[in-house]
């Protein structure tokens, strides 16, 4: 068993070197640069997608969220989500639920996979989750939220983190108080998505309360910001304006694993790298498919990667006929052939 953490007090710590440099550490794991994290995303952040994001510089990656009830019932789908490769480390496993005992049992189960972090999802706004008092739905019951967190922290040796939102609705923007209470029961870090449960993704993220948490003198754990980080300029703005200890990138990485390698130089030097050309999109989408086939088998891989095709080739003129063919075939060699056709067609177009 690999032990990646020495204590539960800190996830990201900035250590000054020579009064000029900053070193970012994950317990004894150290980053030479500002941390960029891939968000846990249902039906997206599986091992093949995490692999390609890791190739392009995601510092920490997370599993899709896993139902506590599913894990303790030995649901095949839930257990499969515990899979990860050593290449992915540091890696977090995220669980969700609405009661103490199932969450404790699920956390212990997740710990047997030896992740670097166990993350609790208190942020999902999807109705089927929130309506049952899980995800961001639990923000209606902050004492229960704190009780679950405390019990999970005490039940496992792996550092526990939380991902949540600003509050349930406009009348309950309570994240400053919530953050203190979660810190007090022992979480190692807190990721805050800058929207409410009720706004889902319909408005721009509000980072002012994320900044308020980060600048609260009572807070000493790392605060990771999430929401509307879409490119280098937005990443630099949120980092510099609100002082968060890391940035978590979610939907903007979908079909765009290059976002991590584009943000990094912008943060460090202000350099804006060009968007990937068609050859690079074909190359990386093929890697994604190959990893998916190896992990899931050809049939399931070809069904599940369909949602990624439009994202990988977003913005290309006249792509619809290729997309339709990619969506229809269940033969992996045929997909590879279509990808080669895409490469030839757009090379001829000068793209």
Residue ranges and their predicted role:
Residues 19-32, 42, 47-48, 155-157, ...:
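Alpha/beta catalytic cores of nucleotide-metabolism and tRNA/nucleoside-modifying enzymes
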Residues 41-43, 66-68, 96-98, 123-125, ...:
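Active-site beta-loop-alpha junctions enriched in small/polar residues
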């Amino acid at each position: 068993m690999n032990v990646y953490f020495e204590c539960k007090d800190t996830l990201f710590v900035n250590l000054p070197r020579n009064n000029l440099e900053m070193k970012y550490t994950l317990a004894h794991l150290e980053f030479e640069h500002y941390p960029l994290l891939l968000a846990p995303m249902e039906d997206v952040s599986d091992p093949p997608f995490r692999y390609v994001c890791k190739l392009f510089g995601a510092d920490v990656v997370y599993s899709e969220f896993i139902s506590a009830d599913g894990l303790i019932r030995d649901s095949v789908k839930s257990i499969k989500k515990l899979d990860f490769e050593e290449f992915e480390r540091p890696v977090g496993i995220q669980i969700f639920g609405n009661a103490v005992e199932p969450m404790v049992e699920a956390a212990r189960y997740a710990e047997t996979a030896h992740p670097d972090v166990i993350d609790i999802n208190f942020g999902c706004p999807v109705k089927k989750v929130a309506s049952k008092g899980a995800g961001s739905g639990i923000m209606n019951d902050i004492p229960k939220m704190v009780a679950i967190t405390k019990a999970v922290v005490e039940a496992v040796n792996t550092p526990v983190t939380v991902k949540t939102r600003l509050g349930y609705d406009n009348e309950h923007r309570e994240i400053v108080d919530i953050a203190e209470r979660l810190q007090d029961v022992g979480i190692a870090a807190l990721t805050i998505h800058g929207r409410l449960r009720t706004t889902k993704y319909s408005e721009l993220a509000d980072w002012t309360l994320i900044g308020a948490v980060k600048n609260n003198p009572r807070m000493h754990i790392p605060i990771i910001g999430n929401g509307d980080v879409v490119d280098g300029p937005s990443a630099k703005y949120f980092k510099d304006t609100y002082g968060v200890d890391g940035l978590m990138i979610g939907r903007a990485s979908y079909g765009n694993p290059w976002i991590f390698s584009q943000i990094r130089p912008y943060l460090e030097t202000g350099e804006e790298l060009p968007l990937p050309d068609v050859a690079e999109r074909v190359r990386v989408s093929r890697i994604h498919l190959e990893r998916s086939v190896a992990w899931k088998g050809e049939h399931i891989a070809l069904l599940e990667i369909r949602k990624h095709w439009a994202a990988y080739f977003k913005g290309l003129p006249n792509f619809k006929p290729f997309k339709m063919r990619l969506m229809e075939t269940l033969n992996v060699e045929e997909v590879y052939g279509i990808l080669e056709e895409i490469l030839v067609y757009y090379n001829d177009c000068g793209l």
